UniProtKB/Swiss-Prot annotation:
This is Cysteine-rich receptor-like protein kinase 18. The modification Phosphothreonine is found at T504. Residues 309-659 are cytoplasmic. It holds the Pfam family PK_Tyr_Ser-Thr. It catalyses: L-seryl-[protein] + ATP = O-phospho-L-seryl-[protein] + ADP + H(+); L-threonyl-[protein] + ATP = O-phospho-L-threonyl-[protein] + ADP + H(+).
Length: 659
């Protein structure tokens, strides 16, 4: 009896080893037809950056991630995917090793992909052009097992054709919803009489349509049949689809396949693998490795621990977009010297900003959300959602984010010259801003807002335009920053209302403060205030004496308009390289932007035309909103002409301080 028990245990162990023995197939496909890049160029740095963060993004996004980084022509698009059901750590390891293999194999190709499988199947792809939703059939990666079938080919073909056809039909007719790795995935097994089991796996990237997935997989099967019929297995891979079959179970599929009742196959070593080159692509391939056999108890414990950990993590995670890049917290801590004081750039309403440097030499600015700010989580999520979809030279570029434990971090490009208010309102630094520079700054801000309102994929209202949210690069070009308050509008939407007024006093439009109503014209009002501040070098929140009365900047400029003395507004630090007509025209446009009625304010498109075409006749402005006038004995914080009652969230009202 004891002998039989031992035999049963031994048989189970042998079957367990056979079932989990696997072959690892790898083929880096570097496309030589879509261009090359210079090593260590901006494109190469962006490529390395997005691939270095791909593993954390894939594991955070249900096993599938697609996104981009940089601005054309150095923009890099990338995607990563693991087979459904892959353990988080296994998936992460596969993506990391696959990315590293691509970096080592494709030294200067601007487009490459790699389906790799050891403990699981995973895909990594990058390109210099958008590819989401596009079916790409070239190049083809092909590998076949050199071992011969040595069976009745006719009988085998019937089973093989039935298996592949049913798998394709099943994938494309009953795909799961959403963009995740299980959308187009199938693995199955078939028994060939008097032969071994056929194990097969098929997968498409979830961004393509079911029709495109069908086309891609069918072509993979046809290509295998044309090149490799009669062999004991093989792989056909394209950028959007993958097909593999073997005469033994293999990684990426073994956990999902239900083995039919049949005699266990004989234990034989897999035959060598051959590589095929097609469509001017370079394929390196073929490595064989055995998966370490672990006990059933260990597997149960690992799976149980993973499920518990994953459930806890899901409760903490926020629904963030797949366009953005997720950084590991340790990477950010290392880049900022663990958020040291000497790296601190400034402090805002919801946290602090630090300068950092990544391992590849890229300088970054890290916005660290305050752990005590309950409202800040909403703004954090909002900023990632909004900025991830934007690409413009006059908008600060979001490189990614980190969301681990209590830490919520936004990673931006580093803009070297701080913010506009750092220069504009400093009595010694503002003399660096001559008229040409101020005019260029106004023009850049105009183009940035116009992109948000009209030219981007989304219609976005910033809601917090102010001098401290305009960053200046090394050439003093403006970049609009801080999208925590921004809102996305529908295509036909023009106005929205909120019960929670956020922003900065002095820049907020009257209808927003009094009624919570905001629109593109709210941003226009803020932009008008910015124009007046840039030309005068004065803060709108300060108070100015005129005719024995106390005025804010907008009211002060309006009185200058009425007295036909707008030239008095000009900052005395501006040099003589300007014409009074041009400066007065800019002030005139600023007054048009701050008119009380939103309908009277021009759109950003019209403003851009007014600024760039001096032949356009400007309409006469009407009195501004928040027309502010106090007697010398009055409290400057109270208006004699109008009073406003509103509920304003104090945590969202920010001071105008350098960042």
């Amino acid at each position: 009896m004891a002998t039989k028990s031992c035999e049963l245990v031994l048989c189970f162990f042998v079957f367990f080893v056979i079932s989990f023995s696997a072959i690892s197939v790898s083929a880096q496909t570097c496309d030589n037809t879509t261009g090359t890049f210079i090593p260590n160029s901006p494109y190469d740095k962006n490529r390395r950056l997005i691939l270095s963060t791909l593993a954390s993004n894939v594991t955070a996004q249900e096993g599938y991630f697609i996104g981009s980084i940089g601005i054309a022509p150095d923009q890099v698009f990338a995607t990563g995917m693991c087979a459904p059901g892959s353990e988080r750590d296994v998936c992460s390891l596969c993506i990391r090793s696959t990315s590293e293999s691509l970096l080592q194999s494709c030294l200067d190709q601007a487009d490459a992909f790699f389906w790799s499988g050891e403990e699981t199947l995973c895909l990594v792809r990058y390109a210099n052009r958008p590819f989401s939703g596009l079916l790409v059939m070239d190049p083809l990666g092909a590998i076949f097992n050199t071992g011969e079938l040595n069976t009745n080919q006719t009988v085998f073909d019937i089973e093989w054709n039935n298996l592949t056809s049913s798998m394709i039909a099943g994938i494309t007719s009953s795909s799961s919803g959403g963009n995740n790795s299980s959308k187009y995935y199938s693995d199955d097994i078939a028994l060939v009489p008097d032969f071994k089991n056929i194990s097969a796996l098929m997968q498409c990237t979830p961004d393509v349509s079911s029709e495109d997935c069908n086309t891609c997989l069918r072509q993979n099967v046809v290509d295998y049949d044309n090149c490799c019929r009669g062999h004991q297995g093989g792989v056909m891979s394209r950028p959007n689809c993958f097909f593999r079959w073997e005469v033994y179970p293999f990684s990426g599929a073994i956990d999902q396949i239900n083995l039919p009742k049949s005699p266990p196959p004989s234990v034989t070593s897999p035959s060598p693998i051959a590589n095929i080159t097609k469509n001017d692509s370079r394929i390196s391939g073929g490595k064989i490795a055995a998966i370490v056999v672990v006990t059933v108890v260990t597997i149960i414990l690992v799976v149980l621990g993973f499920v518990i950990s994953n459930r806890r993590k899901q409760k903490q995670e926020m629904d963030l977009p797949t366009e953005s890049v997720q950084f590991d917290l340790k990477t950010i801590e290392s880049a900022t010297s663990n958020f040291s004081e000497r790296n601190k750039l400034g402090k805002g309403g919801f946290g602090e900003v630090y300068k950092g440097m990544l391992m590849n030499g890229t300088e970054i600015a890290v916005k660290r959300l305050s752990k005590t700010s309950g409202q800040g989580e909403v703004e954090f999520k909002n900023e990632v959602v909004v900025v991830a979809k934007l690409q413009h030279i006059n908008l600060v570029r979001l490189l990614g984010f980190s969301l681990q434990g209590e830490e919520k971090l936004l990673v931006y490009e580093f803009v070297s010259n701080k913010s506009l208010d750092y220069f504009l309102f400093d009595p010694t630094k503002r003399n660096q801003l001559d008229w040409t520079m101020r005019r260029n700054i106004i023009g850049g801000i105009t183009r940035g807002i116009l992109y948000l309102h009209q030219d981007s994929r989304l219609k976005i209202i910033h809601r917090d335009l102010k001098a401290s949210n305009i960053l200046l690069d090394a050439d003093m070009n403006p970049k609009i920053a801080d999208f925590g308050m921004a809102r996305i509008f529908g295509v036909d939407q023009t106005v929205a209302n909120t019960g929670r007024v956020v922003g900065t006093f002095g820049y907020m439009s009257p209808e927003y403060v009094t009624h919570g109503q905001f629109s593109m014209k709210s941003d226009v009002y803020s932009f008008g205030v910015l124009i007046l501040e840039i030309i005068s070098g004065k803060k709108n929140s300060s108070f100015y004496q005129m005719d024995g009365l106390v005025n804010n900047l907008v009211t002060y400029v309006w009185k200058l308009w009425e007295n036909k003395s707008l030239h008095e507004l000009l900052d005395p630090f501006i040099n003589q390289d300007f014409t009074s007509e041009e400066v007065i025209r800019y002030i005139h446009i600023g007054l048009l932007c701050v008119q009380e009625n939103p309908a009277d304010r021009p759109t950003m498109s019209t403003i851009h035309q007014m600024l760039t075409n001096s032949s356009i006749t400007l309409p006469v402005p009407l009195p501004p909103g928040f027309f502010f006038r106090n007697g010398p004995g009055s409290n400057p914080g109270q208006s004699n002409s109008k009073s406003f009652a509103c509920s304003v969230d104090e945590a969202t009202i920010t001071d105008v301080n350098p960042r």
